[in-house]
Amino acid sequence: MERIPSAQPPPACLPKAPGLEHGDLPGMYPAHMYQVYKSRRGIKRSEDSKETYKLPHRLIEKKRRDRINECIAQLKDLLPEHLKLTTLGHLEKAVVLELTLKHVKALTNLIDQQQQKIIALQSGLQAGELSGRNVETGQEMFCSGFQTCAREVLQYLAKHENTRDLKSSQLVTHLHRVVSELLQGGTSRKSSDPAPKVMDFKEKPSSPAKGSEGPGKNCVPVIQRTFAHSSGEQSGSDTDTDSGYGGESEKGDLRSEQLCFKSDHGRRFTMGERIGAIKQESEEPPTKKNRMQLSDDEGHFTSSDLISSPFLGPHPHQPPFCLPFYLIPPSATAYLPMLEKCWYPTSVPVLYPGLNASAAALSSFMNPDKISAPLLMPQRLPSPLPAHPSVDSSVLLQALKPIPPLNLETKD
């Protein structure tokens, strides 16, 4: 049987084979095992690094969610109440975000509108500056509007002053009509502007009329009464005198006064001119009144007026009946010096409430010669001087001489 050399051990003569080393045993090589161990450690290290990465990522995500929740809570607090009431129950995060978006859009639209208005105003101001209008002109126009309104209101109220059923709606309607006329540029208001002037003229004659009563009463009624009595109503007796009323106080006696009145009746035109000149001289009443003032109605009395007069009956609240001076007889002229010093503000009372208003009394009253002196003496005015019933008419003329005439030329 043949030997298989590979199976047989080597011969002895052959060199000794080196010994086995650790590197000759691949299965038992520690480097291989080291490499295997080393790979496991790398795997562990990679797993640890992944775990360490996941831990901060979780923290970051948690913080991010916390910030989102905090912002949503603040938006929920900042939302208007009318938006919160649109939803019922608890507001979810998505609902809060939707409401916030809606509110922001509304605010954006409002801001855009305001911006457009601001731009329009700026463009208008620039156009106004280019046209030449300034602030002062605007202020004047503003004030003139109020003044025009106040003037129209005053004119309307003055025009309808006597109207009792005046309503505010009528005034407002009038103001609207005036505004429409002003806007249309109508010139019809120019014709209505003189309306207050006409009303002023209507109101003004009342005050000058009062002022002209003084000179009118001083001049006109005296001449008219003198002419009326000189035309034929005088009885021709010594009692029909004017006592210096018509500027005839410088005559010699009572006869000459009557003749002068008759002669003056012939030249009434010239006397009328003089009276007109006196009236036009000054419309204000004189500061000092030296004569009693009687109107035309007080100078003429008829028997029917005297009978129907309420002054003849006794009444405590009515003034006594008064007579002018030219009806006083010479026997009662003793009281004229007293009347010269303290003039009574009205006519001298000669009849009293206790006097019987009968026809006989009136007939005797119209004939002053038959009336006794004590009946004509005023009881309400105590006499500071003693009575002289026997004084002649010359004493009366002497007492009336210092009184200046009423700016009338006397006949030479």
Swiss-Prot record:
Residues 142-175 form the Orange domain. Residues 183-259, 275-309 are annotated as: Disordered. GO terms for biological process: circadian regulation of gene expression; circadian rhythm; negative regulation of DNA-templated transcription; regulation of circadian rhythm. SMART domains: HLH, ORANGE. There is a cross-link at residue 279 (Glycyl lysine isopeptide (Lys-Gly) (interchain with G-Cter in SUMO1)). Its main location: cytoplasm. Residues 1-139 are annotated as: Essential for interaction with BMAL1, E-box binding and repressor activity against the CLOCK-BMAL1 heterodimer. It comes from the Eukaryota. Pfam families: Hairy_orange, HLH. The modification Phosphoserine is found at residues 235, 383. Keywords: Biological rhythms, Cytoplasm, DNA-binding, Isopeptide bond, Nucleus, Phosphoprotein, Repressor, Transcription, Transcription regulation, Ubl conjugation. SUPFAM superfamilies: HLH, helix-loop-helix DNA-binding domain, Orange domain-like. One of its GO terms (molecular function) is protein dimerization activity. GO terms for cellular component: cytoplasm; nucleus. It is found in: Cytoplasm; Nucleus. There is a cross-link at residues 167, 279, 288 (Glycyl lysine isopeptide (Lys-Gly) (interchain with G-Cter in SUMO2)). The keyword Repressor applies. Residues 52-107 form the bHLH domain. There is a cross-link at residues 159, 279 (Glycyl lysine isopeptide (Lys-Gly) (interchain with G-Cter in SUMO1, SUMO2 and SUMO3)). Residues 248-259 have a biased composition (Basic and acidic residues). Ubiquitinated; which may lead to proteasomal degradation. Sumoylation inhibits its ubiquitination and promotes its negative regulation of the CLOCK-BMAL1 heterodimer transcriptional activator activity. Homodimer. Heterodimer with BHLHE41/DEC2. Interacts with TCF3/E47. Interacts with ubiquitin-conjugating enzyme UBE2I/UBC9. Interacts with HDAC1, SUMO1, RXRA and BMAL1. Transcriptional repressor involved in the regulation of the circadian rhythm by negatively regulating the activity of the clock genes and clock-controlled genes. Acts as the negative limb of a novel autoregulatory feedback loop (DEC loop) which differs from the one formed by the PER and CRY transcriptional repressors (PER/CRY loop). Both these loops are interlocked as it represses the expression of PER1/2 and in turn is repressed by PER1/2 and CRY1/2. This is Class E basic helix-loop-helix protein 40. It comes from Pongo abelii.
